[in-house]
Design a protein with these regions (language model features):
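Short coil/turn connectors at secondary-structure junctions
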Residues: 10-12, 165-166, 302-304, 325-327
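Conserved motor-coupling elements within RecA-like helicase/translocase cores
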Residues: 266-309
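A short beta-strand element within the Helicase C-terminal
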Residues: 319-332
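Extended, charge-rich low-complexity interaction segments
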Residues: 227, 232, 299-317
């Protein structure tokens, strides 16, 4: 890829970006950077073993700055500028680079190299800072204190990459509101959007909402799982066919599935077959999982199929179940 897209290189390329709704958040993180105060103390501790007094002093300067940020931060603090601190970081990066090149192998080389690379990335992102960024400090839940260069609007950075080709097509089933995505994926103002009609007929759609249940962590209980499982069973009993039931986590999926299976076992008329997605499924296991959706069509199943899956997982997108192979989706 470097051969095609080195600095200053362009070509007759068309970039096709699938699932483009994910690109905004991924670009934000890609063009953002974080440093942790605790990492400076760890690096200082390592370098003390090897008599690197100058580097230790430079790391201590950075630690003192981060300590001052930490003391004034209750939850988070936004900074207009960190120019002086960035200069101190440059000194550390330069001398640490020299040390790593000259030093023989030592047990902590991997840890120190990771610290150096993270520091370099932070400084590289610092060079990109403009009004599309926010610089803030925050206490994380695990107690660590971080300083983050957060790319709120990645459009400028993405446009530099887009300009390396002749055209870019962003496509997704969920690029709405389209104005929001257009403003964050490109700086051009004359981009246009094409809306493709759904292949499904409106009269064939039935949208049902269960407003008395929630997937919030604070709401998760035996009673909540009972109500969700009841909704799943009522749906699969009402119309024979193949369904996918999506959950936010493996744990919640298993908890509701257990209740659902108990309900089916206690109901003699229930002929619903159940599948459940497993973590780290191999290719043959995935194929077997999907093959079950075609069995009903060949008369091998008496009742419905309820496939319990995890949202954002391997069965959440990129599969092609045609016609009656999938008649409904339940999203918890």
């Amino acid at each position: 890829l470097k051969r095609f897209f080195a600095d200053g290189t362009t070509g007759d390329y068309i970039f096709l970006v699938d699932e483009a709704h994910n690109l905004v958040e991924r670009s934000r993180e890609m063009y953002s950077a974080i440093i942790y105060k605790e990492d400076f103390l760890l690096a200082k501790k390592i370098l003390k073993k090897y008599g690197q007094a100058k580097l230790m002093r430079e790391l201590e300067k950075c630690n003192r700055v981060l300590l001052s940020y930490k003391r004034e931060c209750e939850k988070y603090v936004i900074y207009e500028s960190i120019g002086n601190f960035a200069f101190e970081l440059m000194n550390v990066a330069s001398d640490l680079d020299e040390f790593l090149q000259k030093a023989p192998e030592f047990p902590e080389r991997k840890d120190l190299s990771e610290f150096y690379l993270n520091l370099r990335n932070f400084l590289n992102i610092y060079e990109l800072l403009d009004d599309h960024y926010v610089v803030y400090a925050e206490h994380e839940q695990d107690g660590r204190f971080k300083l983050k260069l957060y790319c709120v609007d990645p459009s400028k950075n993405l446009q530099e990459r887009i300009n390396k080709g002749n055209a870019t097509i962003f496509f997704s089933a969920t690029l709405l509101p389209v104005g929001y995505y257009k403003s964050l994926l490109s700086t051009e103002t004359d981009n246009y959007a094409v809306y493709a009609k759904t292949a499904f007929r409106e009269e064939q759609k039935l949208l049902l909402l269960g407003n008395d249940v929630s997937s919030k962590y604070t709401r998760r209980s035996a009673g909540e799982f009972e109500r969700i499982a009841s909704y799943v069973k009522k749906t699969t009993d009402a119309k024979k066919g193949n369904y996918m039931v999506f959950f936010p986590s493996y744990k919640m999926m298993q908890q509701v599935c257990d209740v659902f299976l108990e309900k089916c076992q206690s109901d003699p008329s229930c002929e619903t077959e159940t599948l459940i997605q497993q973590p780290g499924m191999k290719e043959e296991e995935r194929e077997s999982f999907l093959q079950a959706f075609s069995e009903k069509l060949s008369g091998e199943r008496k009742g419905s199929l309820a496939a319990f899956c995890v949202m954002g997982g391997i069965f959440g997108e990129g599969i092609d179940l045609k016609n009656e192979q999938l008649i409904g989706a339940i999203v918890v």
